[in-house]
UniProtKB/Swiss-Prot annotation:
Protein name (database record): Olfactory receptor 2W1
Residue intervals passing through the bilayer: 26-49, 58-79, 101-120, 140-158, 196-219, 237-259, 273-292
Family the UniProt entry places it in: Belongs to the G-protein coupled receptor 1 family.
Stretches in topological domain Extracellular: 1-25, 80-100, 159-195, 260-272
Alphabetized Gene3D superfamilies for the sequence: Rhodopsin 7-helix transmembrane proteins
Protein function: Odorant receptor.
Gene Ontology CC entries for this record: plasma membrane
First-listed, main subcellular location of the protein, grouped into a coarse class: membrane
Gene name for this UniProt entry: OR2W1
UniProt keyword Cytoplasm, yes or no: no
InterPro entries given in the database record: GPCR_Rhodpsn, GPCR_Rhodpsn_7TM, Olfact_rcpt
GO MF annotations, alphabetized: G protein-coupled receptor activity; olfactory receptor activity
SS bond list: 97-189
Organism this protein belongs to: Homo sapiens
Length: 320
């Protein structure tokens, strides 16, 4: 049998944390809890911002998109991850691995670009408040979202296709708990310099360029906030922007460390825990970060809870 086709016939073995079975049991519980928090928190943000007409603004339009993205991102990874952590079966089919890799890279790229667009939205709202709704009109917001998803899809197709075309010479064991690009590059039996440099180059475009734009936007925002005499306005701007900067720091920090190192020098276990952080923990914290100091979102969530309570009460009365 041609060894280069072995993986396509038999799939991949995901080692995960199989060297630490007790850790796997603990991690499976932790991951399941964070996944539940992600599902509940992000779904609540989407519903609350849709039901409250006061939140039908560009800022919350992008926040809904981020919440939807986090739901998709985690769902593309965590169910399979839990199967890997819980049971003895550590395999994933070749087709399953391909789908996971393409979707994972696509959605990860979308988040990088979406965070940059959200910073531009805050820049426009704070630095050009009189022109905010003219500049950030619904048509432009929709075009931005379509462009983000399209560019990210192209990035995913290029990187994943390059990686999957690398021959593995029969090696189908991935020292990871998901089909991640660095793990697949490591099992190749040929020189991977071209692929690694492609990842690095596209990483600069998809990761570093948006990050630079975010930092520039917040430089102007900080300047505008310091000029504002109203303490209440300063506090509101700092709360909103502080939430976004926290999310940016958590997400970009791990992504840069993982993908923008030529040769990917992160150790095996270090790489796994970093992946756990930005695929499991960060999406679950986003709803908390964005609502903790946001009075409008808190009020919208209270309305959603009252609406749910009333609808439940009506259903009970109808049944009785």
């Amino acid at each position: 049998m041609d060894q280069s086709n072995y993986s396509s016939l038999h799939g991949f073995i995901l080692l995960g944390f199989s060297n630490h079975p007790k850790m796997e049991m603990i991690l499976s519980g932790v991951v399941a809890i964070f996944y539940l928090i992600t599902l509940v928190g992000n779904t609540a943000i989407i519903l609350a911002s849709l039901l409250d007409s006061q939140l039908h603004t560009p800022m919350y339009f992008f926040l809904r998109n981020l919440s939807f993205l986090d739901l998709c991102f985690t769902t593309s990874i965590i169910p399979q991850m839990l199967v890997n952590l819980w049971g003895p079966d550590k395999t994933i089919s070749y087709v399953g691995c391909i789908i996971q890799l393409y979707v994972y890279m696509w959605l990860g790229s979308v988040e990088c670009l979406l965070l940059a667009v959200m910073s531009y939205d805050r820049f426009t709202a704070i630095c050009k408040p009189l022109h905010y709704f003219v500049v950030m009109n619904p048509h432009l917001c929709l075009k931005m979202i379509i462009m983000i998803w399209s560019i990210s899809l192209a990035n995913s197709v290029v990187l994943c296709t390059l990686t999957l075309n690398l021959p593995t010479c029969g090696n189908n064991i991935l020292d990871h708990f998901l089909c991640e690009l660095p793990a697949l590059v490591k099992i190749a039996c040929v020189d991977t310099t071209t692929v690694e440099m492609s990842v690095f180059a596209l990483g600069i475009i998809i990761v570093l360029t948006p990050l630079i734009l975010i930092l520039i936007s917040y430089g102007y925002i900080a300047k505008a906030v310091l000029r504002t005499k109203s303490k209440a306005s300063q506090r509101k701007a700092m709360n909103t922007c502080g939430s976004h900067l926290t999310v940016v720091s958590m997400f970009y920090g791990t992504i840069i460390y993982m993908y923008l190192q030529p040769g990917n020098r992160a150790s095996k276990d270090q790489g796994k825990f970093l992946t756990l952080f930005y695929t499991v923990i960060t999406p679950s914290l986003n709803p908390l970060i964005y609502t903790l100091r946001n009075k409008d979102m808190k009020d919208a969530l209270k309305k959603l809870m009252r609406f749910h309570h009333k609808s439940t009460k009506i259903k009970r009365n109808c049944k009785s």
